[in-house]
A protein has these predicted regions:
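Phosphate-coordination loops involved in phosphoryl transfer and adenosine-cofactor binding
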Residues: 8-11, 96, 142
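Rossmann-like NAD(P)(H) cofactor-binding subdomain of soluble oxidoreductases
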Residues: 43, 47, 52, 57-135
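Short, hydrophobic beta-strand segments that form beta-sheet elements in well-ordered domains
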Residues: 37-40, 99-102, 147
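NAD(P)+-binding Rossmann beta1-loop-alpha1 motif at the extreme N-terminus of oxidoreductases
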Residues: 1-66
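Interdomain hinge/lid region at the active-site interface
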Residues: 202, 215-255
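Internal alpha-helical scaffold of NAD(P)-dependent oxidoreductase catalytic cores
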Residues: 31, 48-52, 114, 135-225
Length: 255
């Protein structure tokens, strides 16, 4: 085991240079981890990788995995099961390797093919939208991260969330679907409502409808959120939602 590994520093490889992957990789680098490589297929993802991670090599997926102690899977949720299974069939995963995915809807069961090869499965989803730029690194501070992991390694998932600037809370394997629905609802409905209201104002000739609505929307949303926020936990530890003590996995894809 290397001195860096003993000190808790990991070689991190990222699969997917979308808005989420590039930002989280940069956040882990900021916490002192070494970035071993990133996979990027499209022109946009290659440009993003070059902008956010200029000294990190763009490599084929198998090579990224081979180089890494922690593999960050930041791919669309619908691609995750086949990716994990295909890599397992190719013998890519190895014992003791940390495999982290960022899809809101999945817990760690989707990583079973990697786990059967001896890898350690973790699900970590930051509850925020991403631009894929350095602005997101600042926004990560204080963002809540949904974490799901087997009980013995749950502290690893929580620690990674904290290292990226976030506040971890634990979501049970069985509750990941409900969690994802909540995230989707918050994002889609808030966007639709603002678009509808702005369209009505623009229709009657109101200039800068977004600026007119901004104070009202922010205040309304803040008041609504306050009704559902009991404040910080007494012991300062990670929050746990209903069912999160499920023995299977107590406890997010480009969002």
């Amino acid at each position: 085991m290397s001195a860096d590994r003993r000190a808790g520093r990991l070689g991190v490889g990222t699969i997917g240079a979308g808005r989420v992957g590039a930002v989280l990789a940069a956040a882990l680098a900021g916490a002192g981890h070494a970035l071993t490589g990133i996979s990027a297929v499209s022109d946009a993802s290659r440009e993003r990788a070059a902008a956010m991670l200029p000294n990190v090599p763009v490599l084929p997926i198998p090579e990224v995995i081979e180089r890494s102690e922690l593999v960050l899977l930041a791919v669309p949720a619908d691609e995750l099961p086949s990716l994990v299974g295909g890599l397992a069939a190719a013998g890519a995963w190895r014992p003791g390797q940390l495999v982290v995915h960022t899809a809101a809807r999945y817990g760690v069961d989707v990583l079973d093919p990697a786990r059967r090869a001896g890898a350690i499965p973790l699900a970590i989803h930051p509850a925020m939208t991403f631009t894929g730029t350095s602005i997101d690194l600042t926004r990560l501070a204080g963002t809540w991260f949904a974490v799901t992991a087997p009980a013995p390694v749950l502290p690893i998932a929580q620690a990674l969330a904290v290292e990226m600037g976030g506040e971890p809370f634990v979501v049970a394997e069985a509750d990941r679907g409900a969690y994802a629905d909540a995230i989707d609802t918050a994002v889609s409905f808030s966007t639709a409502i603002v678009d509808q209201a702005a369209g009505l104002l623009e229709g009657i000739g109101v200039p800068r409808a977004g600026s007119v609505l901004a104070p009202l929307v922010r205040t309304s949303v803040e008041n609504a959120l306050a009704r559902h926020d009991p404040g910080p936990t007494v012991d300062g530890g990670a929050t746990t939602i209903d069912g999160a003590d499920d023995e299977r996995a107590p406890g997010g894809s480009d969002t």
